[in-house]
């Protein structure tokens, strides 16, 4: 993966640009790095500014995104959490939304920021940008997808049923993309995504918890409760949503 970030991400830009020009929708996730490594010493802010225009669905974790765009802020988050899970101490309005704002200014179209146990933050660009998604999505869908913002809380999983977090983020995004390909609207896609992530954490590996989207929907329809997130600062956000 080293070739994807050296030289200002030149190889990654070349690859994404080529795929984008083929009219294919592109989804990109990120990976965490140690600050002292070669990857950690790259100018990720400039790299993302260069590659974002060629990405249709950008789906990083909030920690990955912050360490790339706002290193000092990332350090402050860790001090705030005192060694606990950072995502349990974040404020959407103050911590998460500004990162999405930055991505939109770089030309992002659809943003999903994985926020750990609390859930996922969803944000989209205006209609002009949404219409640029590879493969074309049409005027009607573009209208319903443009200028959207939401925080989708995780589904409740009892503590004694949590086995491992392995693959939870990846399966969440896979379910979201699969739901879109199946013709679901963004709201239903978010429900299916968070539900799939919740199923994943109930197994020790990344794949055993995966079930067909139709079966995931049945669990949701049966009244699966959402996680109660008292510590996650949603009040200001929800007032503006």
Locations of regions flagged by a protein language model:
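Ribokinase/PfkB-type carbohydrate-kinase core domain
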Residues: 1-160, 207, 211-223, 227-241
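Short, small-residue alpha-helix embedded
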Residues: 67, 162-185, 190
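Hydrophobic residues in alpha-helical segments
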Residues: 69, 180-181, 200-201, 220
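Short glycine/serine/threonine-biased micro-segments
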Residues: 114-117, 165-167, 195
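Alpha-helix N-cap and coil->helix boundary residues
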Residues: 188-192, 208-211
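An active-site-proximal "capping" alpha-helix that borders the catalytic cofactor pocket
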Residues: 191-200
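Short arginine-rich
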Residues: 199-208
């Amino acid at each position: 993966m080293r070739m994807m970030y050296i030289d200002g991400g030149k190889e990654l830009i070349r690859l994404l640009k080529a795929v984008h020009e083929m009219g294919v929708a592109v989804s990109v996730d990120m990976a965490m790095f140690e600050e002292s490594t070669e990857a950690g010493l790259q100018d990720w802010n400039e790299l993302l500014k260069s590659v974002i225009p060629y990405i249709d669905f950008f789906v990083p974790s909030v920690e990955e995104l912050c360490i790339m765009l706002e290193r000092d802020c990332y350090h402050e988050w860790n001090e705030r959490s005192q060694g606990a899970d950072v995502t349990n101490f974040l404020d959407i309005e103050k911590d998460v939304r500004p990162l999405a704002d930055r991505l939109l200014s770089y030309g992002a179209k659809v943003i999903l920021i994985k926020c750990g146990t609390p859930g996922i933050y969803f944000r989209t660009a205006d209609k002009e940008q949404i219409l640029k998604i590879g493969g074309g999505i049409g005027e009607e869908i573009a209208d319903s997808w443009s200028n959207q913002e939401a925080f989708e809380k995780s589904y409740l999983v009892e503590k004694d049923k949590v086995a491992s977090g392995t693959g939870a983020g990846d399966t969440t995004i896979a379910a979201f993309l699969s739901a879109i390909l199946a013709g679901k609207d963004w709201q239903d896609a978010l429900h299916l995504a968070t539900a799939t992530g919740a199923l994943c954490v109930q197994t020790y590996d990344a794949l055993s918890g995966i079930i067909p989207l139709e079966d995931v929907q049945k669990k949701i329809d049966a009244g699966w409760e959402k996680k109660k997130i008292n510590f996650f600062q949603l009040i200001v956000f929800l007032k503006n949503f």
